[in-house]
UniProtKB/Swiss-Prot annotation:
Gene: Otop1
Annotated source species: Rattus norvegicus (Rat)
Name assigned to this protein: Proton channel OTOP1
Membrane topology: Multi-pass membrane protein
Pfam families registered for this protein in UniProt: Otopetrin
Localization, UniProt: Cell membrane; Cell projection, Microvillus
Gene Ontology terms, MF aspect: identical protein binding; proton channel activity
């Protein structure tokens, strides 16, 4: 009956009928009225609900910064031999901070075990398995380092305080529990006891940063002493050189064993340094995730496949083998005589220039492929990904500082040794290569995975609604499409998609014939193989460039030009501040590139 048909169609008309939409455009439900938005029954979150949590975040971050600043002052006081501050005082402070973190982790693990049956939200991007595997490897070497320190303490027990034996034991226990904690809870999104947990997590972050700073200081003092000994051997009488010797004032039995332990400790410090900074970054992501609402979008599991990367792997392994050979020759020749030192520096600069040129070219090719491919970006909020990008740029600043210092020293020097003209292109390439590599990595981690469904991508482009209406339109389109295949809304949506694709094709045909040919060449498997080879090569090269500065091959110390221009003490301070960030950059870039490889 006509009357019945009109009665049935009136609700659809009041809610926005598809047939009432303009031709060719998907209909959108009307936006909610202001009265509905202001009603108490509205499902939106209250504005004042997040104020206490924002206050807790601010308070906890300020607490952590105060702990860190106070700890840094203790480290500085010990480093400059301040009156009344000895090594035992510093170790007591660090031990107390570790014990406090241990208590919090035990409480958190125990409470999580009691609530193990509850379903908790997880951040699938945080604490990747390969990342936890890396931190486990570094933690194992850190425990070995602690064992060597305990053996060293036993050898010199007559003149060392008890804190120097307690500290490595506490650190070993702290390392074991922290690795267990990160394996089990790095993905947690804490939704209860949020204020207390913020303080516990941020305390853990800055405790690890202080342990990192302590390791960096010990390793830097050792490297500086070796550099001063080389200068004494080479006869630099115009520089006041005082060795900062912390050797105990008593005999060790047997002496040969104690000497071997002392040298072994400093060779393991680079791994301990990487462990502490890696743990602090994982804990920082956990802190940022407290109270966070998880994105309900489907997470694509990354599967790493190692087929089809023969070229990149062979080139990378060749660079790695050459790096080990260069470091061995450098450490043997440097400081033996003036001619041998200059030849060692020239060898290192030639090696580094070659590697940096290859890495820069690989990064440019990878970025060019992304420009040609024009894939959409994943703009969802991700604390782990944002931290990775921020750390890449921040830690690259350490190398940039050293490189610009070398360039300025070359420009201002009155006399220039032969290796100066190798140092100049090396310094320029360090700046350019990290600039290019950062762009490649950051763009790679922000690209959408290959497995994103096509209908999801189409919906992002085709939907013409705004605000809350967009989500309602998406759901209504899905339900109408299943109910009746010939729905005007669906047909209009497809018509709009076809029109957009036609316009894009016309634009591409007018101005990008060459780009289309590149796209034809780089379709599917060819593009992925090329990107994987580039990423594998850059991954191995970053590990290779981590080795020389981590194990004492530091031309910034040994070429002497910067020390003459800036002065010995000022330049040494700059190197000691910038070098830890430069070393960490290479390992962090390698970790980010591994994630990129698994994503491609």
């Amino acid at each position: 009956m006509p009357g019945d048909r009109g009665a049935l169609s009136s609700p659809a008309a009041s809610s926005g009928s598809p047939s009432a939409a303009p031709s060719g455009i998907a209909a959108c439900p009307p936006p909610p009225s202001p009265l509905a938005r202001a009603s108490p029954q509205a499902s939106g979150p209250r504005r004042g609900a997040s104020v206490p949590q924002k206050l807790a975040e601010t308070l906890s971050s300020q607490y952590g910064l105060n702990v860190f600043v106070a700890g840094l002052l203790f480290l500085l006081a010990w480093a400059v031999h301040a009156t009344g501050v000895g090594k035992s005082d510093l170790l007591c402070v660090l031990t107390a901070l570790m014990l406090l973190q241990l208590l919090w982790m035990l409480w958190y693990v125990g409470r999580s075990y009691m609530q193990r049956r509850l379903i908790r939200p997880k951040d699938t991007h945080a604490g990747a398995r390969w990342l936890r595997g890396s931190i486990t490897l570094f933690a194992f070497i850190t425990i070995v380092l602690g064992c060597l320190k305990v053996a060293y303490f036993i050898g010199f027990s007559e003149c060392l305080s008890a804190t120097e034996g307690v500290f490595p034991v506490t650190h070993a226990v702290h390392t074991l529990l922290q690795v267990y904690f990160l394996w089990g809870h790095a993905k947690d999104i804490i939704m209860s006891f949020k204020t207390l947990e913020r303080f516990g997590v941020i305390h853990s972050v800055f405790t690890n940063l202080l342990l990192w700073a302590n390791s960096v200081l010990n390793e830097s003092k050792h490297q500086l002493n070796e550099h001063k000994e080389r200068l004494i051997t080479l006869g630099f009488g115009n520089i006041t050189i005082v060795l900062d010797d912390h050797t105990p004032q008593c005999n060790c039995t047997p002496p040969a064993l104690c000497s071997a332990l002392s040298h072994g400790i400093y060779y393991l410090y680079p791994f301990n340094i990487e462990y502490q900074i890696l743990a602090s970054t994982m804990l920082y992501v956990l802190w940022k995730n407290i109270g966070r609402r998880v994105d309900s979008s489907r997470h694509q599991k990354m599967q790493c496949r190692f087929d089809g990367v023969l070229v990149g792997s062979v080139l990378g392994l060749t660079v790695l083998a050459a790096t080990i050979a260069v470091v061995v020759v450098y450490m043997i020749h440097i400081g033996r005589s003036k001619s041998k030192s200059e030849s060692a520096l020239i060898m290192f600069y030639l090696y580094a220039i070659t590697v940096l040129l290859l890495m820069g070219a690989a990064g440019l090719v990878g970025s060019w492929i992304y420009r040609v491919d024009e894939k959409s970006l994943d703009e969802s909020k991700n604390p782990a990904r944002k931290l990775d990008a921020d750390l890449l740029v921040a830690t690259a600043s350490g190398s940039w500082l050293l490189s610009w210092g070398s360039i300025l020293a070359i420009a201002c020097a009155e006399t220039r040794p032969p290796y100066t003209w190798y140092n100049l292109p090396y310094s320029v390439l360090v700046i350019v290569e990290k600039y290019v590599q950062n762009i490649f990595i950051i763009e790679s981690v922000h690209l959408e995975p290959e497995g994103v469904p096509e209908d999801v991508r189409t919906l992002r482009v085709v939907t013409v609604c705004s605000g809350e209406a967009a989500a309602l339109a998406a759901s209504s389109l899905g339900s109408q499409g299943t109910a009746q295949d010939g729905s005007p809304a669906v047909n209009g949506n497809l018509h709009l998609q076809q029109r957009c694709e036609k316009e894009d094709q016309e634009a591409d045909w007018e101005g990008a014939t060459g780009t289309t040919r590149c796209l034809d060449f780089l379709q599917g498997g060819m593009k992925r193989r090329l990107l994987r080879n580039i990423t594998a090569f850059l991954f191995l090269c970053n590990i290779s460039l981590w080795i020389p500065p981590a194990f004492g091959c530091r031309p910034e110390y040994d070429n002497g030009l910067e020390e003459i221009v800036f002065g010995f003490e000022p330049w040494i301070i700059v190197v000691n501040l910038a070098m830890p960030f430069s070393i960490f950059y290479r390992m962090h870039a390698a970790a980010a590139l591994f994630e990129v490889y698994c994503k491609i």
